[in-house]
Amino acid sequence: MDVNQESLKLHEELRGKIEVVARRHIETRDDLSLLYTPGVAEPCREIAKDYEKSFTLTRRSNLVAVITDGSAVLGLGDIGPAAGMPVMEGKCALFKEFGGVDAFPLCVDTKDVDKLVETIALISKSFGGINLEDIAAPRCFEVERRLKEVCDIPVFHDDQHGTAIVVAAALLNAMRVTGKQMGQMKIVINGAGAAGIAIGKLLISMGFGNIVMCDIDGIICEGDEGLNAGQEEISHISNRNHEHGALADALRGADAFVGVSRPNLVTAEMVSTMKDGIVFAMANPTPEIMPDEAKRGGAAVVGTGRSDFPNQINNVMVFPGIFKGTLAVRAREITEGMKIRAARALAALVTDEQLSADYILPSALDKSVADTVARAVAQEAREQGIARA
């Protein structure tokens, strides 16, 4: 039985990967009167007087909404909200299993930005944070931006920022392996969608050198026609040498390649034109180039999104800890500084003794990672003065 059929069978057996569990059993009349009526009226009155008590008198302080419109689910595309539910349930299970964070899946049946933003904003008082998931670009940029403006809790599009953080951590350690210098690197990112643009912006914020963005038409340059808002924004701060051409042209002389695009776009010959290349081919399930092919082309470090190859670059190492730390200090937002701190903390988990070309990140199954990321994020929030607890 292949993995798809085995997964389907497991889902049929489980009939859902998460459940609601009461934190206190209701067995006596006293239990009933304290946890529900009449006693529950008192915490209601307290919250009505002091809104902040909604975080201390309810589970809100540890509850994240995982929300999709089903428009960009995995590599399946626009399959609709109901079909996106298995992924949202899985995400919630990972939140709990790796970060101890309670999460609830919500699949919203609209592609209209106004309706989606309004719906999420209206239910936001039930949660301590919002994790946006599998919303297609470029709408995802506007949805996140507008929600940040109207919600008083952190809003985080994991496809963008979780991916960017784990890629940044992987690059930091690939630099340690190869001896490359951050400010002198040329990094080519193929795929100018949600993940690619977020990766580019974070790497630029961290001080990485020349970031060159590519899409299906090749290198993105400032002034190109037909760019969406996200691509237009990053075109102003990337490609500082004003290069033109195809992906192969961009890779010539590059130090690193980050692929968040489509299978089999890169060849060994293209990798051979790089300088001691770092290759992160993250298209799933088939990467832009297979690891053995990249190494045949001379790649020094290779990572993919898959668990069956070394150096899995998976954002499960990021989002549980990001939210755990943010919720712990009740920060209203997840800032650029908190993302950078998370990336550096994740990279630092790999010691000099452990570090090698085939080991640049901790295991995606290492449950200590979330605590490390959470502590770093919480400390950064305190230092920035945005912690409320």
Cite the ranges covered by each PLM segment.
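Short, ordered loop/turn segments at secondary-structure junctions
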Residues: 69-71, 79, 108-109, 134-137, ...
